[in-house]
């Protein structure tokens, strides 16, 4: 997802 690429931390 684009959001994961911009904010890796969010994904985690």
From Swiss-Prot:
EC number of the protein: 2.3.1.61
KW Transferase (keyword) present: yes
Transmembrane segments: none
Any one GO biological process: L-lysine catabolic process to acetyl-CoA via saccharopine
GO molecular function per UniProt: dihydrolipoyllysine-residue succinyltransferase activity
Keywords: Acyltransferase, Lipoyl, Transferase, Tricarboxylic acid cycle
Induction data: By 2,4-dichlorophenol.
Reactions listed under catalytic activity: N(6)-[(R)-dihydrolipoyl]-L-lysyl-[protein] + succinyl-CoA = N(6)-[(R)-S(8)-succinyldihydrolipoyl]-L-lysyl-[protein] + CoA
Residue ranges of every copy of the Lipoyl-binding domain listed in the record: 1-12
Cofactor binding note from Swiss-Prot or TrEMBL: Binds 1 lipoyl cofactor covalently.
Pathway where this protein functions: Amino-acid degradation; L-lysine degradation via saccharopine pathway; glutaryl-CoA from L-lysine: step 6/6
Necessary cofactors: (R)-lipoate
Enzyme class (EC, first level): transferase
Kinase in keyword set: no
Cited function: E2 component of the 2-oxoglutarate dehydrogenase (OGDH) complex which catalyzes the second step in the conversion of 2-oxoglutarate to succinyl-CoA and CO(2).
Self-association state and partner proteins as the record states: Forms a 24-polypeptide structural core with octahedral symmetry. Part of the 2-oxoglutarate dehydrogenase (OGDH) complex composed of E1 (2-oxoglutarate dehydrogenase), E2 (dihydrolipoamide succinyltransferase) and E3 (dihydrolipoamide dehydrogenase); the complex contains multiple copies of the three enzymatic components (E1, E2 and E3).
Similarity section: Belongs to the 2-oxoacid dehydrogenase family.
Annotated protein name in UniProt: Dihydrolipoyllysine-residue succinyltransferase component of 2-oxoglutarate dehydrogenase complex
Gene: sucB
């Amino acid at each position: 997802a684009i959001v994961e690429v911009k904010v890796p931390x969010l994904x985690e």
